[in-house]
Curated annotation (Swiss-Prot):
Residues 1-2 form a propeptide. RuBisCO catalyzes two reactions: the carboxylation of D-ribulose 1,5-bisphosphate, the primary event in carbon dioxide fixation, as well as the oxidative fragmentation of the pentose substrate in the photorespiration process. Both reactions occur simultaneously and in competition at the same active site. The active site is at K175, H294. GO terms for biological process: photorespiration; reductive pentose-phosphate cycle. It comes from the Eukaryota. This is Ribulose bisphosphate carboxylase large chain. Binds 1 Mg(2+) ion per subunit. Keywords: Acetylation, Calvin cycle, Carbon dioxide fixation, Chloroplast, Disulfide bond, Lyase, Magnesium, Metal-binding, Monooxygenase, NADP, Nucleotide-binding, Oxidoreductase, Photorespiration, Photosynthesis, Plastid. NCBIfam families: PRK04208.1.
Length: 477
């Protein structure tokens, strides 16, 4: 570099390290309708001011780095940088703050959850100046959400495909989850579907293992679907898990499912990855397959209250990436899930427009415009005594999934399915008659037992089963 060039380049540039807050903390900033907004729970290291911590998050998740660089002068940082525009302390917690960050839309590739997360929840989560960091919520502007296809079909299209209206759908995860042969697995599916369920399901870790290769499982499950449909006159389905070691293999399995004529496939969207999930969602839209999503690995990311990412963010990401169902906790079963918090992200999955509501953990108003909704799936440690609460909590647009609560029936799989179907129909009828499911639920179930011996046997076997543990991740008081 010539001396003259070096002198010119030095104008406006001062090498060294400066506080992030000088550039990235902008409390005067007014957010734009096109900004992606993020709410981070920040726990700074001792001696780090909250403004500096919030600014560091904005910087490290957008245009910043640890020192001033020459190439800052070759672009417009004011146009592209993230901005920490507001910080508030977390009530009841020492040294925790909610830092609000606005990101310009041009920082993100259109239609790519992968790119969005690589920026917003990338290296910044290992930043030494922060003791812990959690992404609590995102506001996705319509200008960005419209670049995504979203769910392959959505709630109304699924209802029309199944010709089932006015009640939650019923499912069952086949157990034991690992070890059955394909033929015995298919037999269990058939018995559950014939007994009254709408769906049966592969467990999340059923892929293509030595005891049951995927193609054999697909064939026997398809046989179970067609046989049970012929006997009941209802449309049935089985969530065939297409998750695989490569995207190419995953699509190959989905193609085979389509050739068999089954209505739905399944994907583990976190372990499989967002790129693979979006590819599968596009294939399902183009080929008339519904897509069930399992959230295996979510608790690694979302369970700790001060670090990671809340499930409401993962739920929004799934709606963008694509899925027609997703597991969303039960409130009453064996898996983590506080009621108001769970209903908050259930609404984010199903509804078109959701108002900001901090009482339910919703930090931003979210407008999905015309993106189809996702059906929440309640699954994990539930049985017939839970049916009134589940019907009241989740409403009609949900899947209530009883694995052990079907297959653990003392008389077998088909009676277990019948017990669940009778319990559901009784609860829906009682609700439609104006009865209070929360107050009269047990009485409704006991009355139905009088004309359903299958339900009576199920009620007897599970009458004392409860999962009474305090949730780890609770709303701030």
């Amino acid at each position: 570099m010539s001396p003259q060039t070096e002198t010119k380049a030095s104008v406006g540039f001062k090498a060294g390290v400066k506080d992030y807050k000088l550039t990235y903390y902008t409390p005067e900033y007014e957010t734009k309708d096109t900004d992606i907004l993020a709410a981070f729970r920040v726990t700074p290291q001792p001696g780090v001011p909250p403004e500096e911590a919030g600014a560091a998050v904005a910087a490290e998740s957008s245009t910043g780095t640890w020192t001033t660089v020459w190439t800052d002068g070759l672009t417009s940082l004011d146009r592209y940088k993230g901005r920490c525009y507001h910080i508030e302390p977390v009530v009841g917690e020492d040294n925790q703050y909610i830092a609000y960050v606005a990101y310009p839309l041009d920082l993100f590739e259109e239609g790519s959850v992968t790119n969005m997360f690589t920026s917003i929840v990338g290296n910044v989560f290992g930043f030494k100046a922060l003791r812990a960091l959690r992404l609590e919520d995102l506001r996705i502007p319509p200008t960005y959400s419209k670049t995504f296809q979203g769910p392959p079909h959505g709630i109304q299209v699924e209802r029309d495909k199944l010709n089932k209206y006015g009640r939650p759908l019923l499912g069952c995860t086949i157990k034991p989850k690992l070890g059955l042969s394909a033929k015995n697995y298919g037999r269990a599916c058939y018995e559950c579907l014939r007994g009254g369920l709408d769906f049966t399901k592969d467990d999340e870790n059923v892929n293509s293992q030595p005891f049951m290769r995927w193609r054999d499982r697909f064939v026997f499950c398809a046989e179970a679907i067609y046989k049970s449909q012929a006997e009941t006159g209802e449309i049935k389905g089985h969530y065939l898990n297409a998750t695989a070691g490569t995207c190419e293999e995953m699509i190959k399995r989905a193609v085979f499912a389509r050739e068999l004529g089954v209505p739905i496939v399944m994907h583990d969207y976190l372990t499989g990855g967002f790129t693979a999930n979006t590819s599968l969602a596009h294939y399902c839209r183009d080929n008339g397959l519904l897509l069930h999503i399992h959230r295996a690995m979510h608790a690694v990311i979302d369970r700790q209250k001060n670090h990671g990412m809340h499930f409401r963010v993962l739920a929004k990401a799934l709606r963008m990436s694509g899925g027609d169902h997703i597991h969303a906790g039960t409130v009453v079963g064996k898996l983590e899930g506080e009621r108001e918090m769970t209903l908050g992200f259930v609404d984010l999955l199903r509804d078109d427009f959701i108002e900001k509501d901090r009482a339910r953990g919703i930090f931003f108003t979210q407008d999905w415009v015309s993106m189809p909704g996702v059906i929440p799936v309640a699954s994990g440690g539930i049985h017939v005594w839970h049916m009134p609460a589940l019907t009241e909590i989740f409403g009609d647009d949900s899947v209530l999934q009883f694995g052990g609560g079907t297959l653990g029936h003392p008389w077998g799989n088909a009676p277990g399915a019948a017990a669940n179907r009778v319990a559901l129909e009784a609860c829906v009828q009682a609700r439609n008659e104006g009865r209070d499911l929360a107050r009269e639920g047990n009485e409704i179930i006991r009355s139905a037992c009088k004309w359903s011996p299958e339900l009576a046997a199920a009620c007897e076997i599970w009458k004392a089963i409860k999962f009474e543990f305090e949730p780890v991740d609770k709303l701030d008081s």
